[in-house]
Amino acid sequence: MTFTFQSEDLKRDCGKKMSHQHVFSLAMEEDVKTADTKKASRILDHEKENTRSICLLEQKRKVVSSNIDVPPARKSSEELDMDKVTAAMVLTSLSTSPLVRSPPVRPNESLSGSWKEGGCVPSSTSSSGYWSWSAPSDQSNPSTPSPPLSADSFKPFRSPAQPDDGIDEAEASNLLFDEPIPRKRKNSMKVMFKCLWKNCGKVLSTAAGIQKHIRTIHLGRVGDSDYSDGEEDFYYTEIKLNTDSVADGLSSLAPVSPSQSLASPPTFPIPDSSRTETPCAKTETKLMTPLSRSAPTTLYLVHTDHAYQATPPVTIPGSAKFTPNGSSFSISWQSPPVTFTGIPVSPTHHPVGTGEQRQHAHTVLSSPPRGTVSLRKPRGEGKKCRKVYGMENRDMWCTACRWKKACQRFLD
């Protein structure tokens, strides 16, 4: 009994051991499998983390690169050279322009008496030494530059009260050898506006002024001056005046000095019937003597019309006191009109004999017109395209009427 019991116990123990070994082996296999799976999962997780980190790095790079301001493409060397060339050209043009190179002119340079008597006004500069001579004419007429003089030639004309601006005379003499740059002359043509109303011919400098003149004087509209239906545009035209010729004409005429004309009043004998023009010729030769540049006194009234008031010369009384012993004369300038009207009164009178009498010589000195003015004949206001065809048929008007000028189709 005991043996059987022990054998059964051994069998049970062996069976238990075998089962335990089998279970252990199974457990070991399962542990190995789980360990392998864990390793594989860890490797996969590691790879996933690596890929995620790489993606995050790429995203960060993209964000950073999008925020960085990329500088523009640099210019090529040729473009830089072209920019330098253009800048140099601009600088050279500015440095050689007459507006920059021309030195300032002293307006109050002292003049000697000889230049005043001669009528030429020297205009000097403080640094360059260029001199230019201009006749006494309008201030708007620029003087023509003359070749430079030496440094010693303009020393007497410098003002002692105004020293030079720190420039030595050696430097000034060096500047004299440079070629003077000719200054640009202003445009001498000036546009004026002439009234085309019959027997009017008034010339003004602005279109608004001539329109107001036509509206108020000729059309008789006294109401609102700003309101206009455009009718006055048909009664004026544009003309061009040469201001240089006007200034030359003004400079050629000078007022006669009362001291010369009153010093020796002309006495005339009794004229014969056959020699009536002799005193006039004498008076004319007397008036053409060298004239002084001194300012006219109260014995003279000098009336100078401007270019835009080019009307026929009108004799204006020179003084309210008229004495029969004076000789009146009038110098009239047709175009440009400059009218000098004066009555010189002689302070001393020669004794007049019974057989002598004084004459009032009226001499008119006229010179040919110098300004080339294209003046058209004033048209009448009877027939015009606007009045013939009407405002509604503008296509039938002539070109002048379409452009609001004087009618060219219906002439007087």
UniProtKB/Swiss-Prot annotation:
Region of interest (Disordered), ranges: 98-167, 255-278, 351-379
Motif CR2 per UniProt: ranges: 401-405
ZnF C2H2-type: positions: 193-218
Extent of Low complexity compositional bias: 123-137
Region ranges (Sufficient for binding to RE2 sequence motifs): 318-412
Subcellular location, principal: nucleus
Compartment(s) where it occurs, according to its Swiss-Prot or TrEMBL record: Nucleus
PTM sites of type Phosphoserine: S225, S228
Motif annotated as CR1, chain positions: 383-387
Gene Ontology biological process terms from the UniProt entry: regulation of transcription by RNA polymerase II
Keywords, alphabetical: DNA-binding, Metal-binding, Nucleus, Phosphoprotein, Transcription, Transcription regulation, Zinc, Zinc-finger
Gene Ontology MF terms: DNA-binding transcription factor activity; RNA polymerase II cis-regulatory region sequence-specific DNA binding; sequence-specific double-stranded DNA binding; zinc ion binding
Gene Ontology cellular component list: nucleus
Function recorded in the entry: Transcription factor which binds to RE2 sequence elements in the MYOD1 enhancer.
Domain notes: The CR1 and CR2 motifs mediate sequence-specific DNA binding, and are important for binding to the MYOD1 enhancer.
Protein name: Zinc finger protein 704
